[in-house]
């Protein structure tokens, strides 16, 4: 049987909030069977739990934010992506502020931290969401589409007319597994244009942004001295974001995802469109690991 997963032990770390610029503590706590992914604001008294649920995404400008009432946990997509990449079903993510720390702008540091906690199988079947028919979300010329597929394949295309974005590196395809995610996706960093930074900071956004946690792009190219980690790092990061955004459906998805210029808001709309019609999907489990179309890292 393919079983649910959590961590063996608590892992604690800290980092800088991308938008607040403040130090943020983050703790990963093992969670119970069918508990799902839950974000907990421990800076509040009493602490407030917000489940990682697509229907609780109320803001999606530049990042995915979970909101319940007037309580928010922002910039969750990179840690959600790491959680999805390792096949973790149940986890409490404690944060000491209204956003998850940005770390180096990728999911790599979160993969490292979660692996320090050790993966632990739980005595319950892992649930998957199998897409049964095409579902799409469209905004202007942007597209996000699910279609039936025996696995989880992500195809993404960006479209930037800019010297830093070579045409041959604006599309990528990943057949999702723990191995492909960790080695081909997780280290891809977020990126932004230097010309936008002053505007963002004037609006109390990106106060923690630096070349240590993002790829900076000016009018001619990449500003970071070390350059890119991959020739197609920009589109790989969009796939990283999509993996995290789509895991907000509550379980690993079995489908093909096609994204064209899609972002957090459109990814979220796609999930809402899936949920709007129960005939779009079914919940499946696998009694035999050989039947599972998505390869995960072994739990030892």
From Swiss-Prot:
Biological or metabolic pathway of the protein: Glycolipid biosynthesis; lipid IV(A) biosynthesis; lipid IV(A) from (3R)-3-hydroxytetradecanoyl-[acyl-carrier-protein] and UDP-N-acetyl-alpha-D-glucosamine: step 2/6
EC number: 3.5.1.108
GO annotation, biological process: lipid A biosynthetic process
GO terms under cellular component: membrane
Annotated catalysed reactions: a UDP-3-O-[(3R)-3-hydroxyacyl]-N-acetyl-alpha-D-glucosamine + H2O = a UDP-3-O-[(3R)-3-hydroxyacyl]-alpha-D-glucosamine + acetate
Keywords linked to the UniProt accession: Hydrolase, Lipid A biosynthesis, Lipid biosynthesis, Lipid metabolism, Metal-binding, Zinc
Active site feature: 264 (proton donor)
Cofactor(s), by name: Zn(2+)
Pfam families: LpxC (PF03331)
InterPro entries found in the cross-reference section: Ribosomal_Su5_D2-typ_SF, UDP-acyl_GlcNac_deAcase, UDP-acyl_GlcNac_deAcase_C, UDP-acyl_N-AcGlcN_deAcase_N
Keyword Cytoplasm assigned: no
Molecular-function GO terms, alphabetical: metal ion binding; UDP-3-O-acyl-N-acetylglucosamine deacetylase activity
Binding site for Zn(2+): 78, 237, 241
SUPFAM superfamilies in the record: Ribosomal protein S5 domain 2-like
Record-stated family: Belongs to the LpxC family.
Function: Catalyzes the hydrolysis of UDP-3-O-myristoyl-N-acetylglucosamine to form UDP-3-O-myristoylglucosamine and acetate, the committed step in lipid A biosynthesis.
Name the UniProt record assigns to this protein: UDP-3-O-acyl-N-acetylglucosamine deacetylase
């Amino acid at each position: 049987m393919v079983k649910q997963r959590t961590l063996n032990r608590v892992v604690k770390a800290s980092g800088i909030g991308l938008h607040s610029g403040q130090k943020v503590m983050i703790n990963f706590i093992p969670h119970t069977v069918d508990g799902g992914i839950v974000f907990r604001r421990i800076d509040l008294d009493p602490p407030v739990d917000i489940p990682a649920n697509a229907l609780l995404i109320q803001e999606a400008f530049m990042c995915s934010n979970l909101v319940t009432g007037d309580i928010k946990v922002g910039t969750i997509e990179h840690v959600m992506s790491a959680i999805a990449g390792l096949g973790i079903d149940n986890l409490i993510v404690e944060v000491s502020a209204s956003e998850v720390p940005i770390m180096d702008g990728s999911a790599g540091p979160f993969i490292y931290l979660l692996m320090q906690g050790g993966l632990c199988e739980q005595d319950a079947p892992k649930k998957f969401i199998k897409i049964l028919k095409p579902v799409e979300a469209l905004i202007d010329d942007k597209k996000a589409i699910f279609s039936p597929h025996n696995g989880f394949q992500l195809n993404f295309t960006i479209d930037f007319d800019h010297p830093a974005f070579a045409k041959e590196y604006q599309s990528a395809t990943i057949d999702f597994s723990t191995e492909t995610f960790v080695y081909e996706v997780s280290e891809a960093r977020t990126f932004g244009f230097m010309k936008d930074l002053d505007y963002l900071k004037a609006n109390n956004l990106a106060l923690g942004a630096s070349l240590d946690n993002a790829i900076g792009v000016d009018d001619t190219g990449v500003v970071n001295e070390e350059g890119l980690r991959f020739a197609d790092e920009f589109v790989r990061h969009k796939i990283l974001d999509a993996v995290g955004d789509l895991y907000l459906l509550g379980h690993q998805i079995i489908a093909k995802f096609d994204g064209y210029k899609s972002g957090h808001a459109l990814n979220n709309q796609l999930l809402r469109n899936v949920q709007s019609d129960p005939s779009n999907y079914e919940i499946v489990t696998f009694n035999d690991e050989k039947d599972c179309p998505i390869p995960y890292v072994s739990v030892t």
